Curated annotation (Swiss-Prot):
Pfam families named among the record's database cross-references: PsaA_PsaB
Name used for this protein in its record: Photosystem I P700 chlorophyll a apoprotein A2
Chain positions recorded as [4Fe-4S] cluster binding sites: C559, C568
Lineage of source species: Eukaryota, Viridiplantae, Streptophyta, Embryophyta, Tracheophyta
InterPro entries, per the entry: PSI_PsaA/B, PSI_PsaA/B_CS, PSI_PsaA/B_sf, PSI_PsaB
Keywords: 4Fe-4S, Chlorophyll, Chloroplast, Chromophore, Electron transport, Iron, Iron-sulfur, Magnesium, Membrane, Metal-binding, Oxidoreductase, Photosynthesis, Photosystem I, Plastid, Thylakoid, Transmembrane, Transmembrane helix, Transport
A GO BP annotation: photosynthesis
A single MF term (Gene Ontology): chlorophyll binding
Length: 734
């Protein structure tokens, strides 16, 4: 008999019900729970799957390049980046006939196309690509990398090439190689590309392999490097009237500290970016030589941690035992990696609009909105995942003996204080913020807007002033024309920074008022509540006062049977599940705030945001309703327009979102009864009863139904907002 799915669990494979399929899918990636798994095979499988992941990423990015080269308008866009709309790819079969064909034929294309809102055109242009041939070359290169990654993944599953467990647990060597190799060498290589290809490209020189050695990136060549006259590389930067991509107004500097933005492209100076990557490369190349491996020099991480015991004994045994705890737990390592990556992704969202690195991307408003929202949602999912794996670590990998009285054990010992403080912060933020919004809402409703409680964010304004923003009149630090820092800044470091902070044509240090103060605290409420749920889930994962033996039930369990009250909905998985709703809710507020403030800035009517954002009806009426009007009008008696597809997606997103509640609110008994009724009717109906299931149909478990509900809620929520965001922005600004 052929092996039934799932092959990794014989117990499940023999299950006579549809549970087999659902539990099989749910545990497919939980390698630790598979039959015949060993620590060695676990590490090897994960290692090999990383190569598969890389192969998919390279294939996907190769596809982006290939489709733009084949069906896009990159060469036309390069001629006029501000007025030509970049094409992502063609649409094969636009539905709804000729009106659809006409609506979607744009950007100078001959047929219907999708417009790119990903920023790839600006990125490729900035790094020196100019022709479709360049894009094809990049696509082929990435396809080759993808193939190599696949082969490497397969190779490392062959007996001869399987690394040993000791190799995986050699933390010092891995850190050295990742710091020096991944970050150091790749940053140095990127600096090389910027200096040799991108910067000459921005000055009208087309550098490729055939002329790479013939064109000096700097007139002096390597002379200043070897003679220690490094300042020569910063002299004669591009002038303020430099036209990007041409020699007009171009300088010769390659590594600068100008600060601020290129006046024409409104993006960071390429020579500043090259300098930044060179500095990063230097730091990480040094960092990659810090840890002790074969040569007996450098630090041993274990020794560092063992020695790291705070004086006075106030933190117990400090970091003793942590090295082995972390090094032997994949979940702990994954939790740390996800936490770091989540924070970095959110920082990317922030910096891509406030300090745009790619030429002309700041003037492509829809792309700016899409990239900000995209990176914030990604960050939210990654950060919640960090806590999920932290909780799994406590259940599966934590050893109380090994961690006696160290900082980790002490976190568990005083978890009540941590959880109650977070709870207090969340309650305080929630009641006060909502109280202010509701008060203001009532005042507007009663026709007395002057009775609103409007609080100026003076501390935040003071911080902005300290960094050089003069409009508030604080006259402090960098905003004080008499301070030594201000005077040094004019000449020594970042002379363009202070100009950029005080120009109104960018998103650096936007002017803030009472509306910003309120929404800031609403977001703080969301962040603290999400964190409360996640932290409580992880710290209570092993047990709580109500259920001291919780760890024996695993990561996700619905209840401990009907006979034990209070054990439902308190697994670590349930905490993750609840936190994701709060995470989505919080990022909703973040993106609403970002988008509305920027729409009014771009349209030149910032007073709309300032006046309407201080009360709830303002957000509902002047942001959500006003900006969804075009979506609600996507199909009308006059035919269709280029926003129709977003209007459809807006409706479809709501449908998917609402479907989530079918799984989230109705419980298992209802479904089991319904399924049995349907199966009974099916078996007694002629023709229909010729078809039999191999598996007896049963309802999803409570935990699985929650997962399916959460997935629909999340996907529908994001789909709906994506359509709203792109349509409302592109409808206004093209």
């Amino acid at each position: 008999m052929a092996l039934r799915f799932p092959s990794f669990s014989q117990g499940l494979a023999q299950d006579p019900t549809t549970r087999r399929i659902w539990f099989g899918i749910a545990t497919a990636h939980d390698f630790e729970s598979h039959d015949d798994i060993t620590e060695e095979r676990l590490y090897q499988n994960i290692f090999a799957s990383h190569f598969g992941q890389l192969a998919i990423i390279f294939l996907w990015t190769s596809g982006n390049l290939f489709h733009v080269a084949w069906q896009g308008n990159f060469e036309t866009w390069v001629q006029d980046p501000l007025h030509v709309r970049p094409i992502a790819h063609a649409i094969w079969d636009p539905h709804f006939g000729q009106p659809a064909v006409e609506a979607f034929t744009r950007g100078g294309a001959l047929g219907p196309v999708n417009i790119a809102y990903s920023g790839v055109y600006q990125w490729w242009y900035t790094i020196g690509l100019r022709t479709n041939g360049d894009l094809y070359t990049g696509a082929i290169f990435l396809l080759i990398l993808s193939t190599i990654s696949l082969i490497a993944g397969w190779l490392h599953l062959q007996p001869k090439w399987k690394p040993s467990v000791s190799w995986f647990k050699n933390a010092e060597s891995r850190l050295n190689h990742h710091l020096s190799g991944l970050f150091g060498v790749s940053s140095l290589a990127w600096t090389g590309h910027l200096v040799h290809v991108a910067i000459p490209g921005s000055r009208g020189e087309y550098v490729r392999w055939n002329n790479l050695l013939g064109i000096l990136p700097h007139p002096e060549g390597l002379g200043p490097f070897f003679t220690g006259q490094w300042n020569l590389y910063a002299q004669n930067p591009d002038s303020n009237n430099h036209i990007f991509g041409t020699p007009q107004g171009a300088g010769t500097a390659i590594l600068t500290l100008l600060g601020g933005f290129h006046p024409q492209t409104q993006s960071l100076w390429l020579t500043d970016i090259a300098h930044h990557h060179l500095a990063i490369a230097f730091i990480f190349l040094v960092a990659g030589h810090m840890y002790r491996t074969n040569f007996g020099i450098g630090h041993s991480i274990k020794d560092l941690l063992e020695v790291h015991t705070p004086p006075g004994g106030r933190l117990g045994r400090g970091h003793k035992g942590l090295y082995d705890t972390i090094n032997n737990s994949i979940h702990f390592q994954l939790g740390l990696a996800l936490a770091s990556l989540g924070v970095i992704t959110s920082l990317v969202a922030q910096h891509m609009y406030s300090l745009p690195a790619y030429a002309f991307i700041a003037q492509d408003f829809t792309t700016q909105a899409a990239l900000y929202t995209h990176h914030q949602y990604i960050a939210g999912f990654i950060m919640t995942g960090a806590f999920a794996h932290g909780a799994i670590f406590f259940i599966r990998d934590y050893n109380p003996e090994q961690n006696k009285d160290n900082v980790l054990a002490r976190m568990l010992d005083h978890k009540e204080a941590i959880i109650s403080h977070l709870s207090w912060a969340s309650l305080f933020l929630g009641f006060h913020t909502l109280g202010l919004y509701v008060h203001n809402d009532v005042m507007l409703a009663f026709g007395t807007p002057e009775k609103q409680i409007l609080i100026e964010p003076i501390f935040a304004q003071w911080i902005q002033s300290a960094h050089g923003k003069t409009s508030y009149g604080f006259d402090i630090l960098l905003s004080s024309t008499n301070s030594p820092a201000f005077n040094a800044g004019r000449s020594i470091w970042l002379p363009g920074w202070l100009n950029a902070v005080n120009e109104n044509s960018n998103s650096l240090f936007l002017t803030i008022g009472p509306g910003d103060f309120l929404v800031h605290h609403a977001i703080a409420l969301g962040l603290h509540t999400t964190t409360l749920i996640l932290v409580k889930g992880a710290l209570d994962a092993r047990g709580s006062k109500l259920m001291p033996d919780k760890k024996d039930f695993g990561y996700s369990f619905p209840c401990d049977g009907p006979g034990r009250g209070g054990t439902c909905d308190i697994s670590a998985w349930d905490a993750f599940y609840l936190a994701v709703f709060w995470m989505l809710n919080t990022i909703g507020w973040v993106t609403f705030y970002w988008h509305w403030k920027h729409i009014t800035l771009w349209q030149g009517n910032i007073s709309q945001f300032n006046e309407s954002s201080t009360y709830l009806m303002g957000w509902l009426r002047d942001y959500l309703w006003l900006n969804s009007s075009q979506l609600i009008n996507g199909y009308n008696p006059f035919g269709m327009n280029s926003l129709s597809v977003w209007a459809w997606m807006f409706l479809f997103g709501h449908l998917v979102w609402a479907t989530g509640f079918m799984f989230l609110i109705s419980w298992r008994g209802y479904w089991q009864e319904l399924i049995e009724t349907l199966a009974w009717a099916h078996e007694r109906t002629p023709l229909a009863n010729l078809i039999r299931w191999r598996d007896k149909p049963v309802a999803l478990s409570i935990v699985q139904a929650r997962l399916v509900g959460l997935a629909h809620f999340s996907v529908g929520y994001i789909f709906t907002y994506a359509a709203f965001l792109i349509a409302s922005t592109s409808g206004k600004f093209g």
